[in-house]
């Protein structure tokens, strides 16, 4: 960017034309399969409770809100889309903006394009197959490999993530020169994520996409716990060429259980000195009314386009990243 006037887009126009073609191809993919495109709000009075996500806040001062109403930019369209599912929408997808007040860099921008879709009556494996179909169509790549979270740790770190004690996880961290972080970290899931990021991610999905599934139940988020093994959740992630592309679940349909998870998130936030975020009670009401058994996935479109174009960074495929927005 140092050689380019700051008003100009960071991405070449040729790349933006290719990006538009990919967006059209994604829409054709879902149209051919009878999946309805929907649009949901980018602002809400409630937000995520996940301790790892930081939402943007804004204030509405219009009619009925003279004192100001706090609104949150959506980190994902998930909550509103589930309300549509509970209302009987059938299979749905959305291509839209999401916002996270976190990183900016090679693979991150605080404003980004998300593809999210939900399939009633699909289990996790059937949705994984559909994600694989989409990736093969857009990226012209080979069919993905699949590994359970446990298998990935055993293969690359020689440790069982479902049974290892924190002391054992720290021993592995020491071999990866991560003791300066791991020795003071008390949260087991944070230790696992550290080991996964450094010891597993760089070695999967090199030549074809890799699906990692059955994450620990403690990392279930909005996913169902497996009925076959209560130690794991019906959750998967997709990696390709060192990039995390997607995160999917067999969706939790129990409103009471979801509320308990949100409340536990907020307790964990309080322990870390983070603000306790407002829980989306409209989502809870929708779940209690009846969310159909379904699976859903969120996929980063900017990263997908980056891979399709063999680009080096997101700024090569989005017109105006945050530094010149």
Curated annotation (Swiss-Prot):
Going by the record, the broad EC class of this enzyme is ligase
Q: Which Pfam families match?
A: tRNA-synt_2 (PF00152)
Q: Which residues bind substrate?
A: 76-78, 118, 251
GO biological process terms, alphabetically, are: lysyl-tRNA aminoacylation
The catalytic activity of this protein is classed by the Enzyme Commission as 6.3.2.-
Question: What GO terms fall under cellular component here?
Answer: cytoplasm
Q: How does it assemble?
A: Homodimer.
Q: Which family does it belong to?
A: Belongs to the class-II aminoacyl-tRNA synthetase family. EpmA subfamily.
Q: What is this protein called?
A: Elongation factor P--(R)-beta-lysine ligase
The organism named in the record is Yersinia pestis
Identify the gene encoding this protein: epmA
């Amino acid at each position: 960017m140092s050689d380019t006037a700051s008003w100009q887009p960071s991405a070449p126009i040729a790349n933006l034309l290719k990006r538009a073609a990919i967006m059209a191809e994604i829409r054709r993919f879902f149209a051919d399969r009878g999946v309805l495109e929907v649009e949901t709000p980018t602002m809400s009075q409630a937000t995520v409770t996940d301790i790892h996500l930081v939402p943007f806040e804004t204030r509405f001062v219009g009619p009925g809100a003279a004192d100001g109403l706090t609104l949150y930019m959506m980190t994902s369209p998930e909550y509103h889309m589930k309300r549509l599912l509970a209302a009987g929408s059938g299979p749905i997808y959305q291509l839209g903006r999401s916002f996270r007040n976190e990183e900016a860099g090679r693979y991150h921008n605080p404003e980004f394009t998300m593809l999210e879709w939900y399939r009633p009556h699909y289990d996790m494996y059937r949705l994984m197959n559909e994600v694989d179909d989409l990736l093969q169509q857009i990226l012209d790549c080979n069919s993905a490999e699949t590994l359970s979270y446990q298998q990935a740790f055993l293969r690359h770190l020689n440790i069982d993530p479902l049974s290892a004690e924190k002391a054992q996880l720290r021993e592995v961290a020491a071999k990866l020169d991560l003791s300066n972080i791991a020795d003071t970290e008390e949260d087991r899931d944070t230790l696992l994520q550290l080991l996964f990021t450094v010891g597993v991610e760089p070695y999967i999905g090199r030549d074809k996409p890799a699906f990692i599934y059955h994450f620990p139940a403690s990392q279930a988020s909005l996913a169902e716990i497996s009925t076959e093994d209560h130690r794991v959740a019906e959750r998967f992630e997709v990696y390709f060429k060192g990039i995390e592309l997607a995160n999917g679940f067999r969706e939790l349909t129990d409103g009471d259980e979801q509320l308990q998870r949100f409340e536990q998130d907020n307790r964990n936030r309080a322990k870390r000195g983070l603000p306790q975020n407002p829980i989306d009670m409209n989502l809870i009401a929708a779940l209690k009314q009846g969310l159909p058994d379904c699976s859903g996935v969120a996929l980063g479109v900017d990263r997908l386009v980056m891979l399709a174009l063999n680009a080096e960074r997101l700024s090569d495929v989005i017109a105006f990243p945050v530094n010149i927005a």
